[in-house]
Regions:
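Short, locally clustered residues in the helix-turn-helix/winged-helix DNA-binding domain
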Residues: 14, 42-46, 107
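N-terminal helix-turn-helix DNA-binding core of bacterial DNA-binding proteins
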Residues: 22-65
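Charged, amphipathic alpha-helical coiled-coil/dimerization segments
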Residues: 71-129
């Protein structure tokens, strides 16, 4: 098998991620949300009291990306940040009522992206399962930093 780009899993995952993110970005525009803002609201809905560090780990985002994002979401009154009462070094993040309201309007966005992908629901479930296995794999090659 030649070493063409279209035969490289890394390239196909990269290109797919870029296109799906682009589709989400277009569909989220009416809500004044970016893709990372969207997944942040999803993560906060799953975890009602989460620290900034935990949120960054959950979303695979570093603090340099996460902090400005949280400031934007806070300015829109979608989230609030508070110091933990147990440990003041920790900052906890919560969805506000407005954040919950906008989040409840968004399931249709995911359905539209899936529909536009031209894959069946069964293929979607299979792909999601394969990708979860890859993402949550205990990788043998570790970053030494």
């Amino acid at each position: 098998m030649p070493n063409h780009l279209d035969n490289q899993l890394c390239f196909l995952l990269y290109a797919t991620s870029k296109e799906i993110t682009r589709q989400y970005t277009l569909l989220l525009k009416p809500y004044d949300l970016t893709y990372t803002g969207y997944i942040t609201l999803l993560a906060l809905e799953e975890n009602e009291q989460i620290t900034v560090k935990e949120l960054g780990q959950r979303l695979f985002l570093d603090s340099g990306t996460l902090t400005p994002l949280l400031k934007k979401l806070e300015a829109k009154n979608y989230i609030c940040r508070e110091r933990s009462k147990e440990d003041e070094r920790l900052m906890k993040i919560y969805l506000t009522k407005e954040g919950v309201d906008v989040r409840r309007k968004l399931p249709e966005v995911s359905r539209q992206v899936m529909k536009q992908s031209n894959i069946s629901e069964q293929q979607f479930v299979q792909l999601k399962n394969v990708l979860q296995n890859i993402v949550y794999n205990d990788w043998k090659i570790k970053d030494e930093n």
